[in-house]
UniProtKB/Swiss-Prot annotation:
Coiled coil: none annotated. This is Phosphoglycerate kinase. It is found in: Cytoplasm. The gene is pgk. HAMAP family: Phosphoglyc_kinase. Keywords: ATP-binding, Cytoplasm, Glycolysis, Kinase, Nucleotide-binding, Transferase. SUPFAM superfamilies: Phosphoglycerate kinase. It catalyses: (2R)-3-phosphoglycerate + ATP = (2R)-3-phospho-glyceroyl phosphate + ADP. PANTHER family: PHOSPHOGLYCERATE KINASE (PTHR11406), PHOSPHOGLYCERATE KINASE 1, CHLOROPLASTIC-RELATED (PTHR11406:SF23).
Length: 401
């Protein structure tokens, strides 16, 4: 999929509209984790270095009523961006109208402007009208009219069809490009799904089979092995007739799990032992069991034999995609499976290793292996949608080369 990228554009003197993902946590008017802002800096700096005018659009949180607006202003984000760039950043507290148009008209080459939260457009005169998140055609057209070029660097919203990504891009044919972050996501996730170096192994964790059915099915067609861990394991156990005690199970997904098991044959690798606990708490009594789990006990992590089995499968892999934890990662006594698998990924030589999803990303950070992995995806839902083989509207709307 050859899409226009920022390097294909002549930026000098141009008003460059940029969709970034600055949806960051804000407490008492201060940005908490600024990772997403930092991730967009290479593209922003490239535009400034090439004498473009960078006009940044992002959503922040969800806005369903007027009262939501004051706490979700982009002002603190603009202030943090100013610190990171070490230069002034203009913040415009509105999403449309003369105040915004005048501020853009006054910009000089190499300057940055941050537009107010795009989701302010979701509430008008007290009504929840979803102009931004419903991709109102007039809004996309209006925003597109404010610039000469468009760069989408917000992979995290690529699976959504909003006025600020699809709306703007579809009104700027031939002038909508991917930023560096978006380009990297398309390259690594895209190659993994469509053209992986083999053996290709996927590691899927997390609590619910229902969240991952599409991903499992798509990756069973593409991968050489699919390792399953985390809470969704026990719905597969139930489908195989293994007793699961009080472990998490989705009763209404047991039939789906059976179908997946039939389709998968020996491609699907399940844990062979589990760490079980007598209550859902870090200080629970625990033991390691193989096979059936007794009533009154629940599996909260994969066991030591499973960890070794998974490592054997991963040892020869040339492409690995990891999405989701192997156990209840947020409790230290049930984090071992996730941490050991992550640690092992960091040691693989000559393999492309891709991590997506909040918990897996957090595990990689905790282990200090982020720099040993090839790519850490910035999009949770967007990464999953990509791995499911979905067409992502935000990417589809970017101009082809």
């Amino acid at each position: 999929m050859a899409k226009l990228t920022v390097e294909d554009l002549d930026l000098a003197g141009k008003k460059v509209l940029m969709r970034v993902d600055f949806n960051v946590p804000i407490k008492d008017g201060v940005v908490g984790d600024d990772n997403r802002i930092v991730a967009a800096l290479p593209t922003i700096k490239y535009v400034l270095d090439h004498q473009g005018k960078a006009i940044l659009f992002s959503h922040l949180g969800r806005i369903k009523k007027e009262d939501d607006k004051p706490g979700l202003s982009m002002r603190p984000v603009a202030e943090r961006l100013s610190n990171l760039l070490n230069m002034p950043v203009t913040f415009v507290p509105v999403t449309e109208g003369p105040q915004l148009e005048d501020a853009i008209a006054k910009m000089e080459d190499g300057q940055v402007l941050v537009v107010q939260n795009t989701r302010y457009e979701d509430v008008k005169d007290g009504e929840y009208v979803k102009r931004e998140s419903g991709n109102d055609p007039e809004l996309g057209k209006y925003w597109a009219s404010l610039g000469d070029l468009f760069i989408n660097d917000a992979f995290g919203t690529a699976h959504r069809k909003h006025a600020s990504n699809v709306g703007i891009a579809s009104n700027m044919p031939g002038k909508a490009a991917a930023g560096f972050l978006m380009e990297k996501e398309i390259k690594f996730l895209g190659d993994a799904v469509t053209n992986p170096v083999r053996p290709f192994v996927a590691i899927l964790g997390g609590a619910k089979v229902s969240d991952k059915i599409g991903v499992i099915n798509n990756l069973l067609d593409k991968a050489d092995k699919v390792i399953v861990g985390g809470g969704m394991t026990y719905t597969f156990y139930a489908a195989k007739g293994i007793k699961i005690g009080n472990s998490l199970v989705e009763e209404d997904k047991i039939d789906v799990a059976k179908e997946i098991l039939e389709k998968a044959g020996d491609k699907l690798v399940l844990p062979v032992d589990n760490v079980v606990a007598d209550k859902f708490a870090n200080d629970a009594n625990t033991k390691v069991v193989e096979g059936d789990i007794d009533d009154g006990w629940m599996a909260l992590d994969i066991g030591p034999k499973s960890i070794e089995e998974f490592k054997k499968v991963l040892a020869d892999a040339k492409t690995v995609v990891w999405n989701g934890p192997m156990g209840v990662f947020e409790m230290s006594n049930f984090a071992k499976g996730t941490l050991e698998v992550g640690q092992f990924l960091g040691t693989l030589e000559g393999a492309t290793t891709i991590v997506g999803g909040g918990d897996s990303t957090a595990a990689a950070k905790q282990l200090g292996i982020s720099d040993k992995l090839t790519h850490i995806s910035t999009g949770g839902g967007a990464s999953l949608a990509y791995l499911e083989g979905d067409v992502l509207p935000g990417i589809a709307a970017i101009s082809d080369k």
